[in-house]
Amino acid sequence: CIRDRFVFNLCIFGGLAGAGIFTAQFYGKDDHNGVRDTMRAKYYIALGSVALFLLVFVLFGENLISAFLHEGNEGLDLGATLGHAKDYIAVMYFQMLPFAVTQVYSSTLRETGETMLPMKAGIAAVLVNLVFNYILIFGKFGAPALGVVGAAIATVLSRFVECAIVITWTHRHKERNRFIVGVYETMRVPPELARQIVRLGAPLLINELLWSGGMAMLNQCYSMRGLEVVSACNISSTVSNLFLCAALSMGNTVAIIVGQLLGAGELERAVDEDRKLIAFSVALSTCVGIVMALLAPLLPQLYNTSGSVKQMASDMLWVSAAMMPFNAFTNTCYFTLRSGGKTLSLIHISEPTRLDVIS
């Protein structure tokens, strides 16, 4: 279920990224009408993605779940697990729309230089999710113990809270967010801009779809190695994602700064700033990787699982730590190419390596 949601989330990100290239450039040359047009285009992309994934999950949801369940997982009640997964997804349908709308607003805010509000809204969503997970999973404060369904409800609530915060703040600060004034007077997108967004955005969407699908296939391969491997992978990925935030945030920084400079026509400055940001990102991620390597034997001890799983998770964390500088370099290069509109090259670079790993 988590991997299916992961594919959906990345497809939303990839789909909106094409319009986001133009958002940053329009904002860089102070063209707020252009920003409004790209925001409207994002709505069509986001809502279309929601409709497509809802259709896929409704028609093929059970088959997608079953791909990660097989007889090789000792001690696992496949029927019960499938039932819990279906119950979870049935509730999670309701988080798709608020998540999509949130990304339309948050991505536009980031591309226009406002990065703090989306972060604060995300933190609020995490806190709401944690609190309601505790209440609804375990039945605290008089609430029923809903287990897996409770976890799904908590996630849905957190998505609505995040969406409400982002929308409310954006519309209350119209002097700062001038693009929001009149954005809903029409939902028309200029045909030429729409064609350019499709031309540049389609490769990004395809790239994210293939990449997330490849990661889901990789995890399906891990699931065939047994529950211990799956548990170790989950621990490793959870911890690694915390440390990866540094590299990922630098990628977004590159997209915003370089995109705005390109929009303002300052090519030489864009090249200079990009080189500095790439170097800083690699240096920062190297330091983060060293810290991660030092903590690799300790962090898995926080989990209530077997010693072999903890050791396997530690080994995976060491590998992830060693790759931190390389991840930072490729991530910032990815956003550099994206901000300059070289989106087709991203598929040529990333997908052959992804297929090699899976094969």
Annotate each predicted stretch with a short phrase:
Residues 3-55, 99-118, 232-296, 327-346:
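Small-residue-rich hydrophobic transmembrane alpha-helices
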Residues 23-95, 143-201, 258-323, 359:
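Short alpha-helical transmembrane segments in multi-pass integral membrane proteins
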